[in-house]
């Protein structure tokens, strides 16, 4: 009988956005498949991989600190992810890092791991990786990455320089992955990319194949196909192209969740032009009105930037007026901060930090009031809730209007006889500006 040798252990740190999380999951899946053991602590690991974020300066700092901690605690560190595209910046602070790769360099990361910590003799009967792969999210929801890169050149963003132009994954491959996830117990799929609504543009929406059937490579066709899986499908990072109108009827028909994450960034035409973003606010308001007429249950999430270079009080007031009229359900707001390599750094009339802070506070105060009013309208109604956590006090879940991590929650006090992934009908009894409380029907 051959002696079972201990599995080499890899520590893993994943920073940044959901798109980075998908990259991490893909690397983890490969490592586990090859027989490596993924461990939660540095001191047990033969090596540590840090998947970094480099989108804004605070994320760069967090990534550099995580690399430093891994070096201090372990000593053997491979760096990958967005900040990896700036190797010199990392080497300047942490010259002892073993290897550095850029984003979505899965094969390179694995090659480096093999070099420093050779592959074990793997017995698939002893260490079975779940078919859907190793997920860093709870088992009942998963992110589905449909493309990489972006064709836009927004002046505040450096994603294209890090991740390149849009490259859509083959639709058959995407749908096969979705099917594997559902077969493994996933109840909710979150569709992500740098620009979800541009899916297929780079391949001229060519026809692919899934289960022998022709399927067009487009966001609408993808949604149609995902709707056949009988799960919650949630769309994120949807750039406001005209064809976004085509997915609203699918939401009204219950085929995908009535939820749209559509980053608008500002409402002043002048600032939008400086950002190189679409600039017709009146048209956007008209579309929102039309979407809600077609799908009254629609939840709209967006993100905005205050304090962008050149933003005047008049520009900011346009943004507040837009919020009052659009009455969006979920809103995130960022104070503009310069990002190394972004075109916006060269713009004149940078806004003082204290003005950014003051505008951010006014923005959030207004939006909290709007969000509270929107949620108050749900009191007394029945909604569907997917359970995320259960403890001795009760259950915490999310409605169709709530994406994990970034939106609110639904609290079911005393509801302990459920498990994560269960979908319940709940009567809403109370609301604040972010969350709901209710009881199972």
Swiss-Prot record:
Cellular localisation: Cytoplasm
Name of the top EC class for this enzyme: transferase
Amino-acid positions noted as binding [4Fe-4S] cluster 1 in the UniProt annotation, renumbered to this chain: 17, 53, 82
Cofactor(s) needed by this chain: [4Fe-4S] cluster
Annotated Radical SAM core domain residues: 136-373
Binding site for [4Fe-4S] cluster 2: 150, 154, 157
NCBIfam families hit by this protein: 30S ribosomal protein S12 methylthiotransferase RimO, MiaB/RimO family radical SAM methylthiotransferase
Protein name: Ribosomal protein uS12 methylthiotransferase RimO
Species this protein is from: Shigella flexneri
Gene name for this UniProt entry: rimO
């Amino acid at each position: 009988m051959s002696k079972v040798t201990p599995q080499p252990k890899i520590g893993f740190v994943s920073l940044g956005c959901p798109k980075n999380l998908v990259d991490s999951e893909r690397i983890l899946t490969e490592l586990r498949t090859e027989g490596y053991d993924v461990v939660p602590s540095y001191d047990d690991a033969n090596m540590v991989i840090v998947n970094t974020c480099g989108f804004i300066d605070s994320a760069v700092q967090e990534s550099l600190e995580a690399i430093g901690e891994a070096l201090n605690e372990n000593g053997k560190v491979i760096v990958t992810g967005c900040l990896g595209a700036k190797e010199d910046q990392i080497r300047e602070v942490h010259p002892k890092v073993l290897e550095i790769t850029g984003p979505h360099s899965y094969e390179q990361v694995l090659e480096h791991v093999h070099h420093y910590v050779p592959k074990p003799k793997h017995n698939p009967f002893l260490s079975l990786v779940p078919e859907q792969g190793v997920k860093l999210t709870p088992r009942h929801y998963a992110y589905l990455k449909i493309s990489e890169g972006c064709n836009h050149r927004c002046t505040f963003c450096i994603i294209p320089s890090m991740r390149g132009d849009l490259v859509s994954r083959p639709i058959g491959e995407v749908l096969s992955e979705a099917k594997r996830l559902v077969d493994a117990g996933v109840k909710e799929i979150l569709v992500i990319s740098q620009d979800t609504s541009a899916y297929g543009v780079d391949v001229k929406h060519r026809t692919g194949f899934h289960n022998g059937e022709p399927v067009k490579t487009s966001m609408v066709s993808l949604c149609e196909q995902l709707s056949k899986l009988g799960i919650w499908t949630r769309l994120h990072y949807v750039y406001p192209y005209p064809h976004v109108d085509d997915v609203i009827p699918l939401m009204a028909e219950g085929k995908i969740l009535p939820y749209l994450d559509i980053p608008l960034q500002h409402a002043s035409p002048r600032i939008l032009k400086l950002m190189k973003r679409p600039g017709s606010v009146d048209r956007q308001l008209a579309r929102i009105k039309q979407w809600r007429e077609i799908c009254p249950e629609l939840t709209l999430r967006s993100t905005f930037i205050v304090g962008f270079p050149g933003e005047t009080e008049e520009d900011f007031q346009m943004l507040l007026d837009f919020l009052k009229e659009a009455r969006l359900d979920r809103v995130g707001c960022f104070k503009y901060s310069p990002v190394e390599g972004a075109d916006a750094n060269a713009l004149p009339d940078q806004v003082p930090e204290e003005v950014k802070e003051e505008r951010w506070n006014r923005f959030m105060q207004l939006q909290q009031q709007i969000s509270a009013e929107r949620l108050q309208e749900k009191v007394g109604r029945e909604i569907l809730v997917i359970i995320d956590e259960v403890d001795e006090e009760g259950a915490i879940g999310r409605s169709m209007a709530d994406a994990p991590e970034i939106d609110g929650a639904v609290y079911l006090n005393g509801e302990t006889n459920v498990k994560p992934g269960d979908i319940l009908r709940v009567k809403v009894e109370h609301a604040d500006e972010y969350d709901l409380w209710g009881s199972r029907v």
